[in-house]
């Protein structure tokens, strides 16, 4: 009986100690986080290049398309320069043809190719797939983008870039006609419009993550339309 009383007393003291350590001396003043929250993952359909490769094994070559900005190239320096030059603090520069003439003439020689794009394009070319680039950019008076992309990604059978911006189109999303015209099976892009254009065309859209320091803000919601999202695709 005495032993039982001793054990009960010890248990009470231990519980009291745990309670003391667990209690907050003062309420938090900021939202903060904890180790458990930091490791939580959203229920997103993540996919890897290796998984895609295995999935496509044994299948006939297909046509695939890529958006350019924040998908295959980190081109924010060009857009930052354009905004500072043509409309500081505003996005009016995106409607200025002089900006598009300048950026498309050769600014992308200073853009950084994303490693995820290198990996994807290498995988698709090894399969014999055709690669197309479909961008929301407005065409300039000179296309300096196509040769930059061909060199950066070692494209064997290069097709001219499709500039869809500023065109009157019969679809809701401006990349949809290009996707349909080239009989694309998979379209890769970072923006909501990329995923929605793929849906409009009735094909598979796969999201690439946008770099956190991109000038293209706000950031889109990954998996917001139920699309697959490539892991480690922000660089």
Curated annotation (Swiss-Prot):
Reaction(s) catalysed by this chain's protein: a phosphate monoester + H2O = an alcohol + phosphate
Cofactor binding: number and manner: Binds 1 Mg(2+) ion per subunit.
Cofactor dependence: Mg(2+)
Assembly: Homotetramer.
Residue ranges of coiled coil: none
Primary enzyme class: hydrolase
Task of the protein: Dephosphorylates several organic phosphate monoesters. Also has a phosphotransferase activity catalyzing the transfer of low-energy phosphate groups from organic phosphate monoesters to free hydroxyl groups of various organic compounds.
Top-level taxon: Bacteria
Leader sequence residues: 1-22
Membrane spanning residue stretches: none
Enzyme Commission (EC) number: 3.1.3.2
A GO CC annotation given for this chain: outer membrane-bounded periplasmic space
GO MF annotations in UniProt: acid phosphatase activity; metal ion binding
Ligand binding (Mg(2+)): 67, 69, 190
Gene3D superfamilies, A to Z: HAD superfamily/HAD-like
Residues annotated for substrate binding in this entry: 135-136, 175
UniProt-recorded name of the protein: Class B acid phosphatase
Active site (catalytic residues): 67, 69
Subcellular location as annotated: Periplasm
Gene that encodes the chain: aphA
Family note: Belongs to the class B bacterial acid phosphatase family.
Alphabetical keyword list: Hydrolase, Magnesium, Metal-binding, Periplasm, Signal
């Amino acid at each position: 009986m005495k032993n039982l009383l001793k054990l009960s007393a010890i248990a009470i003291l231990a519980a009291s100690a745990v309670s003391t350590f667990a209690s907050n001396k003062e309420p938090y003043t900021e939202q903060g986080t904890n180790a458990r929250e930091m490791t939580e993952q959203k229920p997103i359909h993540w996919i890897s290049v290796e998984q895609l490769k295995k999935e496509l094994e044994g299948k006939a070559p297909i046509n695939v398309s890529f958006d350019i900005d924040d998908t295959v190239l980190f081109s924010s320096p060009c857009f930052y320069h354009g905004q500072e030059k043509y409309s500081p603090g505003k996005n009016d520069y995106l409607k200025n043809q002089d900006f598009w003439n300048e950026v498309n003439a050769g600014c992308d020689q200073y853009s950084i190719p994303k490693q995820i794009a290198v990996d994807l394009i290498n995988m698709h070319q090894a399969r014999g797939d055709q690669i197309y680039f479909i961008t929301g950019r407005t065409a300039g008076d000179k296309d300096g983008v196509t040769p930059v992309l061909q060199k950066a990604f070692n494209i064997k059978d290069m097709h001219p870039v499709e500039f869809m911006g500023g065109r009157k189109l019969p679809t809701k999303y401006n990349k949809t006609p290009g996707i349909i015209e080239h009989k694309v099976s998979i379209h890769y892009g970072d923006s909501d419009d990329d995923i929605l254009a793929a849906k409009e065309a009735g094909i598979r859209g796969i999201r690439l993550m946008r770099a956190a320091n991109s000038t293209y803000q706000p950031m889109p919601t990954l998996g917001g339309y139920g699309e697959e999202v490539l892991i480690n695709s922000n660089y």
